[in-house]
From Swiss-Prot:
One annotated GO molecular function: ribosome binding
Region feature G3 motif, mapped onto this chain: 236-239
Reported phenotype of the disruption mutant: A small proportion of anucleate cells, disrupts nucleoid positioning, leads to premature separation of sister replication forks.
Segments for region (G4 motif): 297-300
Protein name: Clamp-binding protein CrfC
Main location: cytoplasm
Presence of keyword Cytoplasm: yes
Name of the coding gene: crfC
Domain Dynamin-type G: 66-402
Chain spans, region G2 motif: 102-104
Positions of region (G1 motif): 76-83
Short name of one Pfam family: Dynamin_N
């Protein structure tokens, strides 16, 4: 019964996708003049690249429906540990780890039961072969000395350059982990080399998902489970602006838009960094059309002063992701621990022991993580102890929960995820097409003079927008100055109060240093929490103020445009952008880590100064902060030296924090405001373009106008049917999802 229902739903999804493709082809070929008429052909506002992208989206959904394939896109920066996370999910090392971007091209990793050894298929290799020929000529002509100035040439890069000079092409098939690593590393080095030699890498040739490399391997966590209808595939996406390639952002957006679900990998230690912010923006751009999950990697670096799991979930759900994800879909983990633990358990189960560390370096990493820094080679022979240590490390990694809640669920319901993805894509397409076509159809019924008036009114709105942007910049700058002045005043108050409290700690020379250390830690932690809370509230208020200022400026323009178009009979089938908060959310510990100068302890300072610095190091989450030439403890300690050193660090912290604060707020607000005004102007320009094209069509002879009216009305009606049927399909799929939970 369940299988029959899936089949019927997939048939309905395929019918709607095919119908949408046909309608899109009609839009492409829709005649704008009668045969034999000399009137020029006029371009639709849906430009050719725009229509081609929609074709690609529909074709991709058809491909996924035919295989009932659920594609889980994984997005994150290199520093977030994306490759390690994928290896942990798969259960074996299928992607190489290097301290540089490793995903220049998207890569599919498909769960293939029984495929123990990974195999990579790279059928669309022709564009790479052409690139190699171009690079071969450039390498012959280039100055190697200049090349070394703009490119880091390590042994892998030298091997690649030698390979290019010899004309060795890429294969279409690679079997085994090491050949796959070599292929993927070479592809990423190829991107770096092409950039250094000023040769365009053929990214556009790999925009279609069927052209990108595919790794087939059995996921260890899914091995032995019963088979289900459908197929689970991971999509490793390029991080935004990885390897200095800004256009990878567009490729990332395209791949995310075509996924069935999205898994974001964020760095626990850098949750509010610029790089992670770019990832969050890319995810938010996908909207609510696909399910979203978050893995917060490197949670093993949490200390007792850091946010706990619940605090991290609340921060990401409410503040960073603006309510687009629930806390239940956020999983703090250690991907490295998860990968190492599972790799060790797999080796023990299949081979009865771990391989020698000198042959496979991951064993050394595992021993260090599971057994501690003082492990010895002899420890690896105690299999029962190693097995227990691997189980403990797996438990500590917290990876079991996302494996169960995400991977197992995705595998069991891959067919439903594929169908739901198709339904949401159909709804988005039909809604956008219907709004556009309805606007065009009504434009043929409006008098030419009225259309000219609408065009002129939007031109005036564009000019007013530019004028208001210049005026509002001054007001926003004033608000920022007020906020920063107030923040700096508060910071100085905290600085003075903290120094007074620190001085009080060192009044009694007879008090044990361990007691001073404990009280010092408490004092510093309290100060940090106070500053963090105040800055959070203070800049939330600034965010609200900026939103109000911009809304007061923009709303009259928006209302005027909508009113004038409504008077002409146009439905509000267009959407103006909304300004979102752009003021950064501050992590005091992270700011301290970024701006404080590392100062070495001198020979004259006692090791007890190192103890106080250690207090700071734990506060800053920097284990080696301030460590220098420490000597053995002496019998006498000058507490005044300790107090002055600590006070100096507090002064430096507050000074540098004020500077970073000003830079980040100014940069963030300026960028956000410019983006907002640019998007608003773009929306007005698009409206103006639609009206101009409606006017041009309206000026054709009556027979052309009538023909266009008939065609547009029929197409609007058909897209209305597609939308209604897609809603019913989505509801039926959701009913099945609900039934699966019980």
């Amino acid at each position: 019964m369940y299988t029959q229902t899936l089949y019927e739903l997939s048939q309905e999804a395929e019918r709607l996708l095919q119908l949408s493709r046909q309608q899109l082809q009609l839009l492409e070929k829709m005649p704008l003049s009668v045969p034999g008429d000399d009137a020029p052909q006029l371009a639709l506002p849906w430009s050719q690249p725009n229509i081609a992208e929609r074709h690609a989206m529909l074709n991709n959904e058809l491909r996924k429906i035919s295989r009932l394939e659920m594609v889980l896109a994984i997005v994150g920066t290199m520093k977030a540990g994306k490759s390690t996370t994928i290896n942990a999910i798969v259960g074996t090392e299928v992607l190489p780890n290097r301290n540089r971007p490793m995903t220049a091209l998207p890569t599919l990793i498909r769960h293939t039961p029984g495929q123990k050894e990974p195999v990579l298929h790279f059928s669309h290799v022709a564009p790479i072969d052409c690139l190699i020929q171009q690079l071969q000529q450039r390498l012959r002509d280039c100055d190697i000395k200049h090349l070394t100035d703009v490119l880091e040439i390590d042994k892998d890069m030298r091997a690649l350059m030698q390979r290019i000079e010899n004309g060795v092409a890429f294969e279409k098939y690679y079997l085994g982990a090491q050949p796959i690593f070599h292929c993927l590393k070479s592809l990423n080095d190829l991107v770096r080399l092409a950039k250094a030699l000023d040769v365009d890498f053929p990214f556009s040739a790999y925009a279609a998902i069927e052209h990108i490399p595919v790794i087939e391997v059995e996921f260890v966590h899914l091995a032995g489970l019963e088979s289900y209808p459908g197929q689970l595939t991971l999509l490793d996406t390029p991080g935004p602006n990885e390897a200095g390639q800004p256009h990878l952002q567009k490729m990332l957006n395209q791949q995310l838009a075509r996924a069935s679900a999205v898994l974001a990998v964020l760095d626990y230690t850098q949750l509010k960094s610029i790089s992670d912010e770019e990832v969050r923006e890319a995810i938010l751009a996908v909207g609510q059309s696909v399910p979203l999950y978050v893995l917060v990697n490197k949670f093993d670096q949490q200390d007792r002063n850091s946010d706990d799991a619940d605090q991290v979930r609340a921060l990401i759900s409410g503040t960073l992701m603006k309510g687009c994800i629930t806390p239940q879909q956020i999983f703090p983990v250690s991907s490295m621990w998860g990968y190492l633990a599972n790799r060790a358990r797999y080796e023990l189960a299949n081979n009865g022991k771990l391989p020698p560390p000198e042959q496979q370096r991951w064993v050394e990493d595992f021993a260090h993580a599971a057994l501690g820094r003082r492990w010895r080679h002899a420890d690896l022979a105690d299999l029962e102890h190693i097995r227990h240590a691997a189980d403990q490390l797996w438990e500590d990694s917290l990876f079991a929960q996302p494996i169960q809640a995400l991977l197992h669920a995705a595998y069991a319901n891959a067919s439903l995820y594929a169908l739901r993805s198709a339904a949401h894509k159909l709804l988005n397409y039909a809604q956008q097409a219907r709004e556009y076509l309805d606007f065009r159809a009504h434009g043929l019924n409006v008098a030419c003079e009225q259309l000219r008036q609408n065009i002129h009114q939007i031109e005036e709105s564009l000019q007013l927008l530019q004028l208001n942007q210049a005026q509002v910049s001054g007001e926003i700058k004033h608000e920022i100055e007020l906020a920063l002045t107030s923040a700096n005043h508060f910071l100085r108050q905290q600085q003075d109060a903290l120094k007074v409290q620190l001085a009080a700690l060192f009044q009694d020379d007879s008090e044990p240093l361990s007691e001073i250390r404990t009280r010092c830690e408490t004092l510093l932690q309290t100060a940090q929490n106070t500053i963090s809370r105040d800055f959070t509230l203070r800049f939330a208020e600034l965010e609200s103020t900026l939103c109000r200022v911009l809304t007061d400026v923009i709303r009259p323009i928006e209302q005027q445009v909508k009113m004038e178009l409504s008077e002409s009979g146009f439905r509000p089938g267009f959407h103006f952008p909304v300004f979102h908060g752009v003021v950064p959310h501050f992590n005091t510990r992270q700011l301290f880590s970024e701006v404080i100068s590392r100062q070495e302890a001198t020979d004259e300072q006692s090791t007890r100064l190192g103890v106080v610095r250690e207090t700071f190091s734990r506060w800053l989450n920097q284990p080696d902060w301030g460590r220098g030439n420490e000597k053995s403890p002496t019998e006498t300690v000058d507490y005044s030296v300790l107090q002055r050193a600590l006070s100096a660090e507090v002064d430096l912290y507050c000074q540098q924090m004020a500077k970073v604060l000003a830079e980040q707020v100014d940069e963030s607000v300026t960028a956000g405001m410019n983006t907002f005004f640019a998007e608003f102007a773009s929306c007005l320009t698009e409206l103006q373009t639609r009206l101009r094209e409606s006017l041009a069509l309206r000026q054709q002879n009556e027979s052309v106008v009538r023909l266009m009216q008939q065609q547009l009305q029929q197409t609007v009606m058909t897209h209305g049917w597609i939308y209604t049927d897609a809603q019913l399909l989505r509801d039926d799929i959701q009913t099945l999802f609900t039934a699966e939970r019980y």
